[in-house]
Amino acid sequence: MTDAPLSRIRNFCIIAHIDHGKSTLADRLLQDTGTVAARDMQEQFLDNMELERERGITIKLQAARMEHIANDGEAYILNLIDTPGHVDFSYEVSRSLQACEGALLVVDASQGVEAQTLANVYLALEQNLEIIPVLNKIDLPGADPERVRQEIEAIIGLDTSKAITCSAKTGIGISEILQAIVERIPPPVDAIEEPLKALIFDSYYDPYRGVIVYFRVMSGQIKTRDKILLMASKKNYELDEVGIMIPGERKVDSLHAGEVGYLAASIKSVADARVGDTITLANNPANNALPGYTEVKPVVFCGLFPTDADQYPDLREALARLQLSDAALKYEPETSSAMGFGFRCGFLGLLHMEIVQERLEREYDLDLIVTAPSVVYKVNMIDESTVMVDNPATLPGPQKRKSIEEPYVKLEIYTPNSYNGTLMELCQERRGEFIDMKYLTTDRVTLHYELPLAEVVTDFFDQMKSRTKGYASMEYNLIGYRPNDLVCLDILINNEKADPLTTIVHRDKAYNVAKGLVEKLKELIPRQQFKIPLQASIGSRVIASESISAIRKDVLAKCYGGDISRKKKLLQKQAKGKKRMKAMGKVDVPQEAFMAVLTLNK
């Protein structure tokens, strides 16, 4: 590996919406610069989780260092910092942007600009990055690069006269992209003489070396055996090794300002090396940390229970291990009369929740029951205190609380013009407040709504996709709490409260949700030998009920004719047995019933 001066280092990332070809483009850049030999190449090289390749999305950040001989004959070092494209991981995106001086904006030439592209572009513009527009997938028959150019100019306001057209799949335009990175992205600022400041943009847990931290040196230099201080967690460590990612790690003696690398220092948990934290030297610390570090707060909560109670310790260990590499995951033990022991977990969003659930089932071989997701409510109590509630079953009683506030989001939907009617209908059904509507081009519209997060986390995304045949895309940001007329809806199965089915709903919707829920449960819960009443109640008032009729054994089958009193005796005996059974009997509720809350189109 050559050691290049600062003027020949370029740090850049790739911004794109899901499926616009970002990972494929990264593959081509690695191949074209000879960083990865053709025989080692596999698709989505930087997506190293099996789940990432399967879903075709980037979850964890990756980094790679490439060498490129430019047209002027000099060898340049290009550090690619890969970013996730999904809205749930927007904090990770903002940190990786901070570690760069430029960004490739990849837009699918057949699809045009989408919601997440925009959100990330605005983050990049805030960091003053040099943005190079790249129109990908021009080999597709439906590609229309000219229309997409106009869209980028109209929506984002970027000059697209120098936009590069390419096809990452076939390799067209890759050398132009490499040349543009060298020519148009500025080199890092020379700050080698200043005290060490390095930004952590990712970390993962290695069972042998502890946490491996990926960082970008902003000023000063860092060497093996240095004693470092992490400014947010205030922890001190001695460095065991420092190195660069090629992809694959290679040790070096030191890294200076402008370079990207990794370090290992026997750090025990990812929580100690938080993403966005600043690394400095313990004996010569920097005066202030790099800006932009925030604690990531979970937004969506749900209960995870093992189907087999014996797996509870395994689930606890699996969550502890996952948390080592995923600092955004929060969990605490919870118990439920219907489900036994489990955990209440907090996630950044629905995709994050699905990914954690899949990783638990795949990597740790667990069989899980997941309760419906809920958001964090703010309850104002009569004694002037406030309580944050993430589990509807723990909501304080109506006599103790004054009001309930729920989180609201600002929602942006990008859609072809022909679908805006059905989307406006969907947002109104979900208690949305219309803000404005803008025409981006003659046939593309952006809708702005403010609506409760609780209405978004269930099946809003699926509904939006199915109503627009997959053409619409959305992006949301939290905008704070607002009071609403909310009530707690309890579900009673055989006169026993089923905690996992408890939901918090708006009073106007309570009856419809309750009715839909008990009808759904009636379909899903298997019949028993006795009658099962299903009730939905607000406090002590039942507002909807259904009952599952009993399976009846024909006890008179053996009586041919004979005296009526004999038949009565048998029927009374059966009725007595059923009565006892009803008092003692326990109803097993299948997993589908707990997800009924989710699939109910509120």
From Swiss-Prot:
PROSITE patterns associated with the record: G_TR_1, G_TR_2
Highest taxon, organism lineage: Eukaryota
Keyword entries, A-Z: GTP-binding, Hydrolase, Nucleotide-binding, Organellar chromatophore, Plastid, Protein biosynthesis
Protein name: Translation factor GUF1 homolog, organellar chromatophore
Reactions listed under catalytic activity: GTP + H2O = GDP + phosphate + H(+)
Family: Belongs to the TRAFAC class translation factor GTPase superfamily. Classic translation factor GTPase family. LepA subfamily.
Originating gene: lepA
InterPro entries hit by this protein: EF-4, EFG_III/V, EFG_V-like, EFTu-like_2, G_TR_CS, GUFP, LepA_C_sf, LepA_CTD
UniProt: GTP binding residues: 16-23, 82-86, 136-139
CDD domains assigned: EF4_II, EF4_III, LepA, lepA_C
Record SMART domains: EFG_C
A single BP term in Gene Ontology: translation
